């Protein structure tokens, strides 16, 4: 039997070819792109780790120390005006400062506030807030305004919630993605964007695991250094100290990207200014209204915000019945975040292949489909809690209220994990083929205002009900919320289909 050398060579060639394809399938990053990719991933990791810590902390403070119903008031009456103000400031800064300096300025403002809250404001909140007797007298005499009175009486908690709510959309959605979109081509975005989350989204799991063990960390530090501060004050200081450290790391990483990693071609893109240096916020909104592409992206963000907020309100209200202190609630949120991190990694691996192999639309429509299906399950159980509780009690020896919280948690885990990967990636890909002027001003308004309009629109409806009917609860208005939820999800799916057409047309136009 003779061995043909050419056949052996062909066999090895085929093996190498298949191995190369497998490697590209799993890790599509080219060798000369590794440093750029990893530094962006590190920056994303730090920003998202901070985002998850302050998100859990703001909910823990407000829901347990003011009341879950106040969240809807804060989102509309506090977060919404702040989002508009930030948009005005950003558009003006774009025409006056380098993109790099804008990043440093805004990040520094956030970090300074978090430091003040941790070490000055919260330890002295009893002195800074109105006395409980005064608050009680005011709420008794003005029952329809009781939630506004509570928010103003505990102004520092309300302010922290507003600032923490702005972080995801100002720092992550606007500053981070604006930077990445300017240094990434359409071809790179198809390989980079889905995989950014593979390493950076582990921050969700680690943040959750950290919060789950917050009590143990608290006890260890108290015993080690013989501290006399209150348990909850120390917990908040621990969380915000980690936030400050990661904030400094993110600033340093951003500096390295600008001065050590990116080449001159990328740096010239970052110094981009709009052709009209005196562009106003009115012109920015006019640009959005005249661009169907941007309008559809804003519609996706609005629908996501409304849909998630309609489910989160009743879920958080139910959770406070079991988890009554900020530390307990933070541990609960930590557990939820840990599962979100695991599922996020799964969706990252799935999403990377879907975007590259199947296309933009399939990836983009998965998130609204998941939100719709799981949301319907939650509302179905919530609206028929008594009947469902009897059935579950016969098969599962547990508290029906805990089952309701678990179903809501599953809904949030699946919705958020798909949002962080598939939704965010496809949304950012939709910006890439647009002209630079629309990318900057259009993205600023669409991301910040579009996101907050979604959350605040739903929040306004809920707060209005609580003002008109002070005795109403999330349980009593659940069916009404479910109907709005269904209509919102159907609109979301329609907008995704239409944006797919615009995205394809924009790519064809940009390649001419």
Swiss-Prot record:
Q: Which UniProt keywords apply?
A: ATP-binding, Cell membrane, Membrane, Nucleotide-binding, Transmembrane, Transmembrane helix, Transport
Cite the Pfam families for this sequence.
TLC
Residues forming coiled coils:
none
Q: How does it sit in the membrane?
A: Multi-pass membrane protein
Task: State any single GO MF term.
Answer: ATP binding
Membrane spanning residue stretches? 34-54, 71-91, 102-122, 157-177, 192-212, 231-251, 296-316, 330-350, 361-381, 390-410, 448-468, 476-496
Q: Where is it found, in Gene Ontology cellular component terms?
A: plasma membrane
Subcellular localization, as worded in the UniProt entry:
Cell membrane
User: In terms of one coarse class, where is the protein primarily found?
Assistant: membrane
Protein family = Belongs to the ADP/ATP translocase tlc family.
Q: What job does this protein perform?
A: Provides the rickettsial cell with host ATP in exchange for rickettsial ADP. This is an obligate exchange system. This energy acquiring activity is an important component of rickettsial parasitism.
> What protein am I looking at?
ADP,ATP carrier protein 4
């Amino acid at each position: 039997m003779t061995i043909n050398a050419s056949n052996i060579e062909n066999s090895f060639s085929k093996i190498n070819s298949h191995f190369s394809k497998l490697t590209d399938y799993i890790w599509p990053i080219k060798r000369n792109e590794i440093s750029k990719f990893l530094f962006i991933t590190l920056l994303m990791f730090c920003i998202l780790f901070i985002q998850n810590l302050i998100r859990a902390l703001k909910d823990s403070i407000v829901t347990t120390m003011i009341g879950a119903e106040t969240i809807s008031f804060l989102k509309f009456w506090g977060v919404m005006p702040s989002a508009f103000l930030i948009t005005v400031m950003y558009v003006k800064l774009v025409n006056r400062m380098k993109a790099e300096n804008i990043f440093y300025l805004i990040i520094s403002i956030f970090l300074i506030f978090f430091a003040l809250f941790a070490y000055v404001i919260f330890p002295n909140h009893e002195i800074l807030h109105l006395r409980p007797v005064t608050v009680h007298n005011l709420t008794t005499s003005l029952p329809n305004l009781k939630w506004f009175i509570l928010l103003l009486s505990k102004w520092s908690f309300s302010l922290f919630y507003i600032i923490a709510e702005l972080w995801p959309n100002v720092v992550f959605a606007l500053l981070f993605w604006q930077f990445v979109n300017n240094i990434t081509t359409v071809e790179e975005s198809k390989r980079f964007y889905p995989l950014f989350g593979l390493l950076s989204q582990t921050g969700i799991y680690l943040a959750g695991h950290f919060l789950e063990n917050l009590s143990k960390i608290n006890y260890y530090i108290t015993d080690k250094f013989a501290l006399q501060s209150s348990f909850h004050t120390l917990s908040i200081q621990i969380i915000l100290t980690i936030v400050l450290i990661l904030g400094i790391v993110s600033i340093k990483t951003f500096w390295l990207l600008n001065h050590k990693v990116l080449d001159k071609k990328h740096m010239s893109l970052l110094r981009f200014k709009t052709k009209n240096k005196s562009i106003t916020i009115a012109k920015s909104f006019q640009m959005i209204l005249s661009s169907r592409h941007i309008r559809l992206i804003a519609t996706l963000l609005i629908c996501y915000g409304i849909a998630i907020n309609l489910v989160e309100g009743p879920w958080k209200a139910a959770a406070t019945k079991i988890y009554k202190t900020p530390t307990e609630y933070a541990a609960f949120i930590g557990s939820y975040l840990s599962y979100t991190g695991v599922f996020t990694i799964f969706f990252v691996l799935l999403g990377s292949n879907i975007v590259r192999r199947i296309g933009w639309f399939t990836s983009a429509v998965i998130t609204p489909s998941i939100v719709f299906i799981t949301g319907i399950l939650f509302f179905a159980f919530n609206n028929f809690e008594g009947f469902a509780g009897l059935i579950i009690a016969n098969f599962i020896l547990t508290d029906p209220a805990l089952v309701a919280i678990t179903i809501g948690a599953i809904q949030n885990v699946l919705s958020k994990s798909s949002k962080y990967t598939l939704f965010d990636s496809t949304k950012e890909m939709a910006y890439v083929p647009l002209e630079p002027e629309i990318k900057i001003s259009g993205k600023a308004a669409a991301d910040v205002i579009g996101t907050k309009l979604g959350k605040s629109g739903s929040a306004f409806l809920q707060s209005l009900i609580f003002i008109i009917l002070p005795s109403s609860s999330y349980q009593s208005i659940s069916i009404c919320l479910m109907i709005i939820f269904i209509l919102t999800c159907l609109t979301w799916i329609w907008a995704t289909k239409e944006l797919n057409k615009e995205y394809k047309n924009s790519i064809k136009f940009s390649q001419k």
